[in-house]
A protein has these predicted regions:
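Surface-exposed, beta-sheet-biased, low-hydrophobicity segments with strongly acidic/polar composition
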Residues: 1-154
Length: 154
């Protein structure tokens, strides 16, 4: 169920979507357009697989990347959502740091991305770790994110 931001005293977002990664969706890569009510293109946002661990099928995804592209900003904002294991692993951290700010994923946690004229609030709605021979809390069985976009105030 989508968050009613107006009940929280916030302006309604320009766009709001839910997306779920499930173990086995090796090609998970979602992107969405941001348009004004008049249909003017403002940018895009999305989420996709950033890093997997272990070997074999399906991929054991240990980190996802959330990004926000603003047509008025030369730089795309990116944050990397990491499993507990990945967040505490110096080798994985070193590989992923060039992609963007590293964030530990926790249920109900929120991550804010900002560009010149847009902001994206990502909320971890649901998080379930895979169980298996790999370290505990190392890869996602499923993760549901709510992504909401507003004009940036300022």
């Amino acid at each position: 169920e989508k968050t009613n931001f107006e009940q929280m005293g916030l302006a309604p977002p320009i766009t709001q979507t839910m997306t779920t990664y499930v173990l086995g969706d090796d090609l998970y890569d979602e992107s969405f357009s941001i348009d004004t009510q008049a249909g003017e293109f403002m940018g895009e946002y999305g989420v996709g697989v950033s890093e997997a661990i272990g070997v074999g099928e399906p991929k054991k995804v240990t980190a996802l990347e959330i990004w926000l592209f603003d047509k008025n900003d030369i730089k795309t904002a990116t944050k990397v959502l990491m499993s507990q294991h990945a967040f505490n692993d110096p080798g994985i951290r070193a590989r992923l740091e060039p992609k963007g700010e590293l964030v530990l994923v926790e249920p109900q946690s929120q991550v804010l991305l900002e560009t010149a004229t847009l902001q994206l609030l990502a909320t971890v709605v649901d998080l379930e770790y895979g169980r298996g021979p790999l370290p505990s809390d190392s890869y996602f069985e499923r993760i549901t994110l709510e992504l909401a976009i507003w004009p940036r105030q300022g």
